[in-house]
Amino acid sequence: MTAMKAIVWRLPKMPKIKITKTYEVTKITAILTLVGFIMGLEVPSLATFLTNKTFNEYFKYPTPLQQGLLMGSTPLGGIMGCFICCIMNDRFSRIYQFQSGIIIWNIVTLLNFCIWDILGLLICRMIKGMILGNFSILVASYANEVIPRGKRGSTMSYIQLCLTIGILVMHYLCIALSLWDSHFAFRIAWCIGIIPGLLFWMASYALPESYHWLVLHGKMSEAQEIQHNLAKKFNESQPRDAVPEMSKIELAGDFWIGVNDLDFSKKLPRGSFKPLILGMTLQLLVQFSGINIILGYITYICEIVGLEGNVKLFTSSIPYFINMVLSLLPITFIDYTSRKLITLLGGFPISGLLITIGALFVKYGQDTKPIDGNRSLVWSIGENPFVGGWILTLCFLIVGIFAMSLSSIPWVYTNEMLPSRVKVKGFAICVTFGWLGNFILTFLCPVMIERLKGTTFIIFGSLTFLISLSVLIWFPETKGMSIEDIDKFFEFESKEGTNLHGEKGIKTPDSNSNGGSTRSSQEGQLHKPIKLKSDEEMII
């Protein structure tokens, strides 16, 4: 971790490009959706070629363990990227992190064209995974800081929608290129990501800096100007849900609350454990729903049920298309519906479908020689096309249910469930836990398919059911709950006067009087100055 910090601290400055800043929610959301599109491109870029003859001959038919490592290298890098985001959070601005990350993405994307062995492919995918892991926290944190509360859900839904569009576009590109019997086919596919990468790099200069981050660095005048511009633009389009223009004193409240603190050397305040466990449980629900396995290894499932050639390739594209189309629906209701209800309406049906798929595989599956030399595929139900059709239909149904429920809701649900003082740090922990679960399942999936066969789906279905049951019993409904209600529900820091950093009292100026109001404790009072840009001090 110390070595990683030393590298991060020496990052160069970004080139200055004069582009007019935008403060409109729709334009900011449009730019952020490019991040979702970029993240989506990486999902099928390797999976589509895993059963390709040219790919397997070039890389000498990877073993199930090697296949798992290749597929799992991206989420493994994602875990590292989450830690990098936490290290960079305090020192570097949100926009700088976006720009430095996308530059590295573009460089590594070009290097993909020069890959000649499994090790090189593994390293490139891991580095790109680090960028995606960084962005997975960064884009959610930035949206939470800049987008008004009533529009955050739809913003995340648009980002998720563009992620599914990226998956679909890349899948069809890979299908088209796989028809070309040459190693240049997968090389070109892995370089496509530089196009949206360059677009996002240029568009990032139009994004306003997070005024939360500016407050934490004492740049109060700049922070106030950005917050006022964002509020004015939003109020012009949404007068009923007007956002107040905050004073410097109100903005300074974020400093003592510590909402943006990602320093894990500092102890989390009392009451943080339960919401963190619930947030991590939601991430487990997303992973055990089987969506990454179905989307990542759909070509495996097609071959197991007996599909070949172009029929296999185009059938494997159906779940990506379903995922994209049905991801449009949450945008229409995510800001107005029960978080808990939508989560349950996704979790329970998916668990039943997974168990049904596993039961069909167990009953009708038969051992066979490795299909097309792929040592992960040693069983088949090719002699039962009717059963194979049902299995594929159930897989498509799982993808559809997931797209309408678990694709967006858990991210909003987790963010709303976390108390204000640990929202960013808690969300980072939950996302990191999600990447860890993604890596373990993606890495083990080829081995599980080889050894456990259909039982793999029964295990996923059973765990999804148990997690959904825990959501039903223990999870609160956060729709309509204020920050104070959330803190009260989890008994978060109910002892008056203790803040995130273990400080026992903070003195804040009272805007309604000449004096000040003091948050006191048994150990006395604490005055904490913020250095302002104009060399003045504000005591909070």
From Swiss-Prot:
Residues 509-524 have a biased composition (Polar residues). The lineage of its organism: Eukaryota, Fungi, Dikarya, Ascomycota, Saccharomycotina. One of its GO terms (molecular function) is transmembrane transporter activity. It is a multi-pass membrane protein. Its main location: membrane. It comes from Saccharomyces cerevisiae (strain ATCC 204508 / S288c) (Baker's yeast). It is found in: Membrane. Residues 51-67, 123-126, 180-187, 297-313, 363-385, 450-455 are extracellular. This is Probable metabolite transport protein YFL040W.
